[in-house]
A protein has these predicted regions:
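Pyridoxal 5′-phosphate
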Residues: 1-423
Length: 423
């Protein structure tokens, strides 16, 4: 089974990458910890930990005060907006910080819902995380009609014909995930945005799962909104929303009277998590530094981020192929999602399986005892597990690969699964 680890580790400098993450040195029951649980939250580099600690030591204050630590807090927040602007390909004042993607999406659904009523329609998909489903489905209480797009069960992809057929002149918003957090499918979001705009509807993209695996460019997508979570791309537990400036200024958020009416601050409820915002800049700079090590001639942050993802995509794809090919040799195993390596440009290295005779929880528990961290369940993609009729039996065993994972970890996982199944 060929791999490209040697070549790609040179391009990515895998030794340097792994040295940035202190958690990768952990052991469990004498086994090196292998973090294959990244779809639920990635590990963080030391610089993120340091940035959070440094803020609390030297800059801890509320905003807009007439003194040094408050000034520094303002500067740290502005710096993080600039960093996320480079990460997303947008202006800093189009970046909104929040508790998480779920709370940001509820806030936006409430604001957009103020303008909707009977006769209006919203298009959702059965592939999405519930955080990009339930906040919009709740608008049915206002008389809004909810249209649900089906999936192709054979490969867990969106039925694009069904999606196109459900968008019409009454459609006001189409919400879709960039990539499935359960089975790894990468959706054709650019086409979804085009279809939405052709009908005069807004396009809302959940990029939480895609963000650590590929470059984001909201200008190229022309989406109206895009949300992600920094703890899924090597940062602290926070949510980030991009909104076109025209929408952030026009829509009316629910907010406190004392809150500024200026955008993007008008969308940020209460006091933000300033220390985690400091960590966001550090995690974006980490990704950019990967790109600078790939191509030392690059200095600017946005080009460096793109260079990093160019290599991350190739490396993760090689790991994904090795894992998928290996899983298909395990008796009684069933892989959910795209399994043909020739189509892996349409999937993230997030693998969901079931193995006859073993519940996902049993498998995850036994793997965890060997230092192999995986997830079991539905991962809040409840519509998908119900459609595939696996919810009643514990959902899937999910394994997620990231650029800090190695071929050795993939091989350890496969050996462990074979031994567990053979007993």
């Amino acid at each position: 089974m060929p791999t490209t680890q040697d070549a790609l580790s040179t391009a990515l400098d895998l030794n340097w990458i792994r040295s940035q993450f202190p958690s990768l040195a952990e052991k469990v029951n004498g086994y090196p910890a292998a973090y294959l649980d990244g779809p639920g939250g990635t590990q963080v580099p030391q610089r993120v930990i340091d940035a959070i600690s440094d803020y609390l030591k030297h800059s801890n204050a509320n905003t807009n005060g007439a003194y040094a630590t408050s000034h520094r807090t303002n500067e740290i927040i502005a710096g993080a907006r600039s960093a996320m602007g480079d990460f997303l390909g947008c202006d800093p004042d189009e970046v909104v910080f929040g508790l998480n993607m779920t709370s940001l999406t509820y806030a936006m659904s409430r604001a957009i819902g103020r303008e909707l009523g009977p006769g209006d329609e919203i298009v959702l998909t059965l592939l999405d995380h519930d955080a990009n489903f339930a906040p919009w489905e709740a608008l049915a209480e206002r008389g809004v009609t909810i249209r649900r797009v089906a999936i192709n069960p054979a490969d867990c992809t969106l039925d694009m014909n069904d999606l196109a057929g459900k968008i019409n002149s009454h459609t006001k918003l189409v919400a879709v995930g960039y990539a499935s957090n359960a089975v790894g499918t990468i959706n054709n979001v650019k086409e979804v945005v085009r279809l939405a705009h052709a009908a005069g509807a807004l396009a809302y993209i959940d990029a939480v799962h895609y963000a650590p695996h590929g470059p984001l460019d909201v200008r190229a997508l022309d989406c109206d909104f895009l949300v992600c979570s920094s703890y899924k791309f090597f940062g602290p537990h926070m949510g980030v929303l991009y909104g076109k400036g025209e929408h952030l200024r026009r829509l009316r958020p629910y907010k406190l009277r004392a809150n500024t009416n200026e955008s993007p601050n008008r969308w940020e409820w209460g006091t933000l998590n300033h220390e985690c915002i400091a960590g966001i800049t550090a995690c974006v700079d980490y990704v950019a530094d990967i790109g600078r090590r790939v191509n030392p001639s690059i200095s600017s942050r946005r080009p460096a981020i793109l260079a990093a993802y160019g290599e991350i995509v190739k490396y993760e794809r090689s790991l994904c192929e090795r894992l998928v090919v290996g899983l298909r040799t395990i008796p009684e195993s069933r892989l959910y999602g795209i399994a043909d390596p020739g189509r892996f440009e349409h999937r993230c290295p997030t693998i969901a399986v079931r193995i006859d005779g073993h519940t996902p929880l049993e498998l995850s528990t036994k793997l965890g005892e060997r230092g192999l961290f995986t997830w079991d369940g539905n991962y809040y993609a409840l519509n998908l597990t119900e459609q595939l009729d696996v919810e009643k039996d514990g959902g899937f065993l999910r394994m997620g690969l990231f650029h800090y994972n190695t071929v050795d970890e993939v091989d350890r996982l496969l050996v462990a699964l074979r031994e567990i199944v053979a007993r």
